[in-house]
């Protein structure tokens, strides 16, 4: 592939400009979808309103599968935001990628582990925050010593494992999809430098696999957005529910 990403330093921190660009674009797209689909609400909903209501109902069902809605209602906005943001982020690099002077600018932001691990750390931080808010510091801390204190090290390891798997699962699936799409695109174009006939053959041979893989990547990106949102709600339910 041979692509790198342009970086800059600010206040001693190094920022990947491609990541900054793509997460900004993803955020703007999600904001536009939310505004355009809820701009005019009515008893007889438009197609746009129906679409947003379907997303809200879908997330409500995800929450309801892990906790009762009385407990889970405050997390509905979080779930909808996560689902939409991760889905849009997964899709951005699917149709094409853009590189300038060997610097990759247009890609799926979730194809970078820094983005997915940041999302995972933020989510796990929220689970602890909501747990403390629901139970208080003393009662929440006691949960780590139940049913027996010997399990405390395992529970701490579990927290780190949950964070790693949440972030790396999303990254691995999206990154692998973009790598294979890049290889197929290379198959379609690289042979033109040797021979036009070989280039045409390579293009024809790559068209069907690219269409199939893009369709599969669309499915995987959708599933990964669902899994990330679902696991977020499961982890929150473990922290705020009395039975846990």
UniProtKB/Swiss-Prot annotation:
It is found in: Cell membrane. One of its GO terms (molecular function) is proton-transporting ATP synthase activity, rotational mechanism. One of its GO terms (biological process) is proton motive force-driven plasma membrane ATP synthesis. The chain crosses the membrane at residues 17-37, 74-94, 112-132, 148-168, 171-191, 196-216, 217-237. Coiled coil: none annotated. Keywords: ATP synthesis, Cell membrane, CF(0), Hydrogen ion transport, Ion transport, Membrane, Transmembrane, Transmembrane helix, Transport. Its main location: membrane. One of its GO terms (cellular component) is proton-transporting ATP synthase complex. Pfam families: ATP-synt_A. The keyword Transmembrane helix applies. It is a multi-pass membrane protein. InterPro entries: ATP_syn_F0_a_bact/chloroplast, ATP_synth_F0_asu, ATP_synth_F0_asu_AS, F0_ATP_A_sf. It comes from the Bacteria. The keyword Secreted does not apply. Gene3D superfamilies: ATP synthase, F0 complex, subunit A. F-type ATPases have 2 components, CF(1) - the catalytic core - and CF(0) - the membrane proton channel. CF(1) has five subunits: alpha(3), beta(3), gamma(1), delta(1), epsilon(1). CF(0) has three main subunits: a(1), b(2) and c(9-12). The alpha and beta chains form an alternating ring which encloses part of the gamma chain. CF(1) is attached to CF(0) by a central stalk formed by the gamma and epsilon chains, while a peripheral stalk is formed by the delta and b chains. Key component of the proton channel; it plays a direct role in the translocation of protons across the membrane. Belongs to the ATPase A chain family. This is ATP synthase subunit a. The lineage of its organism: Bacteria, Bacillati, Bacillota, Bacilli, Bacillales.
């Amino acid at each position: 592939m041979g692509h790198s990403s342009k970086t800059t330093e600010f206040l001693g921190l190094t920022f990947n400009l491609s990541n900054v660009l793509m997460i900004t674009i993803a955020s703007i797209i999600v904001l536009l979808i939310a505004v355009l689909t809820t701009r005019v609400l009515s008893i007889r909903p438009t197609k746009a309103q129906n679409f947003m209501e379907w997303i809200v109902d879908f997330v409500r069902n995800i929450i309801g599968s892990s906790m009762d809605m009385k407990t889970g209602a405050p997390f509905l906005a979080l779930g909808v935001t996560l689902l939409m943001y991760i889905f849009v982020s997964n899709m951005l690099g699917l149709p094409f990628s853009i590189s300038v002077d060997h610097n990759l600018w247009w890609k799926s932001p979730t194809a970078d582990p820094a983005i997915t691990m940041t999302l995972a750390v933020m989510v796990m931080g929220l689970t602890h925050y909501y747990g403390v808010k629901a139970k208080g510091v003393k009662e929440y801390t006691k949960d780590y010593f139940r049913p027996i204190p010997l399990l405390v090290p395992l529970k701490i390891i579990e927290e780190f494992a949950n964070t790693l798997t949440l972030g790396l699962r999303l990254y691995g699936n999206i990154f692998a999809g973009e790598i294979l799409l890049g290889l197929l695109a290379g198959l379609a174009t690289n042979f033109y430098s040797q021979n036009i006939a070989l280039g045409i053959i390579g293009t024809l041979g790559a068209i069907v696999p690219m269409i199939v893989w893009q369709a599969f990547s669309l499915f995987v990106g959708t599933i990964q957005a669902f899994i990330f949102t679902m696991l977020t709600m499961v982890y929150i339910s473990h922290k705020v529910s009395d039975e846990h």
